[in-house]
Amino acid sequence: MAAVAEREVLGMVAAVAAMVVMMAPPAAALVPYGYGYMLDDPFRVLEQSPLRPAGGVAAAAAAGEPAAVALARCDWKETPEAHVVTVDVPGVRRGDVRVEVDEASRVLRVSGERRRAGAAEEEEGERDGVRWHRAERAAGRFWRRFRMPPGADVGRVAARLDDGVLTVTVPKVPGHRGREPRVVAIDGAGAGDMEAEVVKASKAEM
């Protein structure tokens, strides 16, 4: 009897656990900027970043942001004259950031590396007498890609790094206008045309 009662209790616990899992909201709903947002972006922002922030992916998820954008969050705005992309890269030196443009595909690529605390001292041989009590700042490599829309002059891209913010400006082609939608003529007889043909046939028979 005791074994039967124990099995019943375990079955009830399993059922309750399953209900809790089913009632839990989707994880993506807790993330303000995730893969669903990227797929809905009309400018097709392409995201990839093999970065490893302090604490790993779990720490980034707990902080409410995907690991893919933890090191280099960005904004993209369009003005009448240009597209302006700003990327937060605090602690990243100018020599550790690279901006590339593929003119054929109109893809702008920003990549870089934020070095871990103490890396510079180790390279310069300044380890003697230095003790690190804490190193929490995220470190790792990152890269972000953006496909520029037609009309962006990817041959005149300019970039500037100030106070940990990288600003990339892509001017627009002067006088560029997007293609107007082409109206397609529809072939085939409409209801009115068919009625006219019937009337003509009737008169001919008379």
UniProtKB/Swiss-Prot annotation:
GO terms for biological process: protein complex oligomerization; protein folding; response to heat; response to hydrogen peroxide; response to salt stress. InterPro entries: A-crystallin/Hsp20_dom, HSP20-like_chaperone, Small_HSP. Coiled coil: none annotated. Transmembrane segments: none annotated. GO terms for cellular component: endoplasmic reticulum. Residues 65-187 form the sHSP domain. Keywords: Endoplasmic reticulum, Signal, Stress response. It comes from the Eukaryota. Disulfide bonds: none annotated. Induction: By heat shock. One of its GO terms (molecular function) is unfolded protein binding. Residues 1-29 form the signal peptide. Its main location: endoplasmic reticulum. It is found in: Endoplasmic reticulum. A motif (Cell attachment site) lies at residues 94-96. May form oligomeric structures. Belongs to the small heat shock protein (HSP20) family. This is 21.9 kDa heat shock protein.
